[in-house]
């Protein structure tokens, strides 16, 4: 979940090394990542190499590995605190920056690269996607998820002059929008901008779907589930793309 700011200032580095910064993948994200991975691995012959970029505390990776046994899963993250927690889950772990630098993996070694709610934390999204494409085998899959700037409730918030949910103007507090947790989001995407970026970086066969957001107020959850059918308005954008 924590994506190492390789070329950013001390403020971001300190933020991601702060043990109070949330590292947990969360049950919803972990389950949907496991489902996407299991569905993708059905087409892979033999043991697969799965790389989880920004693995955080390893919860999502561990659930995915249990759902799809027999495969090798490598977790990469910058936060030493996150990797310390992930180590107890029995994963293969690498501490490395993932923002603006090369991943410490050989070209064409991964069957699947997971970027689960990490891209919104990065300064250099182009380089991160270039690296994901590089380490994938031909025909390999990228599984990516990210909050949706154009989520159905964000459209309403913008209309009344409020900051959209998921967006942040400070690393020290939340201002002008609902919520209180600073997550370190630097980039936000709509389904259209994300599709365009992935295509520009060389990915093909781009498929989008939507997912709900766990922190939506209870009374609004039925609407949030309904909007999952429209990725452009869903809370979370899920992407499956291939290296062609």
Residue locations for each model-derived region?
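Conserved class I S-adenosyl-L-methionine
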Residues: 47-56
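A short acidic, Gly/Pro-enriched loop at the edge of an enzyme's catalytic core
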Residues: 101-112
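Class I SAM-dependent methyltransferase SAM/SAH-binding core
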Residues: 58-101
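A short beta-strand submotif of the Rossmann-like class I SAM-dependent methyltransferase core
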Residues: 115-116
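Structural signature of beta-strand start/N-cap positions in the alpha/beta core
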Residues: 49, 72, 109-111, 141
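S-adenosyl-L-methionine-dependent methyltransferase catalytic module, highlighting the catalytic core
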Residues: 3-32, 59, 78-81, 85, ...
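Conserved alpha-helix/loop element of class I SAM-dependent methyltransferases that forms part
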Residues: 28-46
